[in-house]
C-alpha cells in the first residue's frame, strides 16, 4: 500500500505554538504539546519511557499497561498510541496484545520536499516562506489490507471515541475541518484539553499493489521458462 501524504509543517507548529500557551505554563510548552500529540519527542523517544527527557533514545520495545495505563505520559488520543495500542486495549494486557498483533503492519516512510528549516528550528520554520509542498511517501506491507491497514485507519486512527474518548480524532490526520474537535491530555489533578483541532496531513494520492511472495515468483518464473 502506498500513500503520498502532504504535511502542513508550518501550520502544525503555528497551531502548537498558540495552543500550548493555554495548556502548559513553561518555556518548553510548545515541544511538550507537540510530543503529546505525536506520542514521541522529536528525537524519537517515546513519552511512555521518557516522559520528561526530549533527548531519550528512540525505542519501540515497550507497552503501556505497566507504566502508562492512565495515559498521563502518552495520551490515549496521540497518533502513536492510536496506530499501535499495544497492550492498552480492553480485556487486559495479554488479550490486548493478541488483538493488536492481528492488525500490525510493516511500514516505512520517506520525506519529500525541502525542509522549512535546515536546522529544524521551530522559529525559523514559522518565519519561512512556505510555498513548496512537502510531506511523506508512506509505504506499508500487509498480508491482509482490510484486516491490517484499513482496520487501523478506520477503527483506531479515525475513531473519535477511541479508547473511551468522546470527540477526539487523531491529532495529526483525523480531524474534519468542519467539526469542533478536541485533543484530551490526561493529567493530575485534572485533564487538559486542546480545542479547535485542525488537520495537518492530507492524502494526495495512493494505491494498493500486489507483491508476490518469493515462492510465488519462483513458480511464475518456472512457468515462464517451461511455457
PLM feature segments, named:
Residues 1-227:
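Long, histidine/aromatic-enriched segments associated with O2/redox biology
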Amino acid at each position: 500500500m502506498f500513500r503520498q501524504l502532504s504535511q502542513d509543517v508550518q501550520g502544525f507548529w503555528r497551531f502548537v505554538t498558540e495552543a500550548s500557551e493555554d495548556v502548559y505554563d513553561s518555556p518548553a510548552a510548545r515541544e511538550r504539546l507537540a510530543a503529546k500529540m505525536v506520542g514521541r519527542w522529536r528525537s524519537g523517544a517515546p513519552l511512555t519511557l521518557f516522559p520528561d527527557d526530549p533527548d531519550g533514545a528512540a525505542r519501540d520495545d515497550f507497552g503501556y499497561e505497566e507504566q502508562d495505563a492512565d495515559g498521563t505520559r502518552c495520551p490515549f488520543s496521540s497518533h502513536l498510541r492510536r496506530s499501535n495500542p499495544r497492550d492498552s486495549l480492553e480485556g487486559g494486557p495479554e488479550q490486548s496484545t493478541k488483538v493488536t498483533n492481528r492488525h500490525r503492519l510493516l511500514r516505512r516512510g520517506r520525506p519529500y520536499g525541502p525542509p522549512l528549516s535546515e536546522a529544524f528550528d521551530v522559529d525559523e520554520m514559522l518565519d519561512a516562506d512556505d510555498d513548496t509542498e512537502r510531506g511523506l511517501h508512506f509505504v506499508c506491507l500487509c498480508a491482509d489490507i482490510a484486516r491490517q491497514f484499513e482496520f487501523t485507519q478506520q477503527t483506531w486512527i479515525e475513531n473519535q471515541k477511541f479508547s473511551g474518548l468522546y470527540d477526539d480524532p487523531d491529532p495529526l490526520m483525523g480531524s474534519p475541518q468542519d467539526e469542533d474537535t478536541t485533543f484530551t491530555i490526561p493529567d493530575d489533578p485534572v485533564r487538559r484539553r486542546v480545542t479547535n483541532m485542525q488537520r495537518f496531513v492530507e492524502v494526495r494520492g495512493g494505491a494498493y499493489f500486489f507483491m508476490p511472495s518469493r515462492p510465488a515468483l519462483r513458480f511464475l518464473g518456472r512457468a515462464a521458462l517451461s511455457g
